Amino acid sequence: MGERVLEIRELKNCEIDDIMKIWLESTIEAHYFIKEEYWKNNYEVVRDIYIPMAKTFVYCGEGKIKGFISIIDSNFIGALFVHTKSQGRGIGKSLLEYVKNR
């Protein structure tokens, strides 16, 4: 069953650490076959280079960011991540639909 969308909006600079936690946890879980240290070593590159070069939108529910999508050059999905505890609720689909309709 899908989660009720409370808000999808553009990322605020003060929320970068929040989405980076989602990125790190989701990436480690999805890529269990790659050493965790690899992702931790690339954390700063993602935070300092890739996130700033993209337009990022966050999915908020229950007062927390539950997922995000980053668009590069207005037409390329550079990232789509949903918090591991919120997966399977239609959040990723909602984020995709949001950017497709912008």
Per-region residue spans from a language model:
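A short beta-loop-alpha structural element at the N-terminal edge
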Residues: 6-21
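Residues within well-ordered alpha-helical secondary structure of globular protein domains
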Residues: 22-25, 101
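Conserved GNAT-fold acetyl-CoA-binding loop/helix
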Residues: 24-47
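A short helix-loop-beta-strand connector motif used in the catalytic cores of GNAT acetyltransferases and
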Residues: 47-58, 76
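Conserved beta-hairpin
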Residues: 55-67, 72
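A short, internal acetyl-CoA/4′-phosphopantetheine-binding micro-motif in the GNAT/acyltransferase core
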Residues: 77-87
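Conserved acetyl-CoA-binding loop-helix of GNAT-fold acetyltransferases
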Residues: 88-101
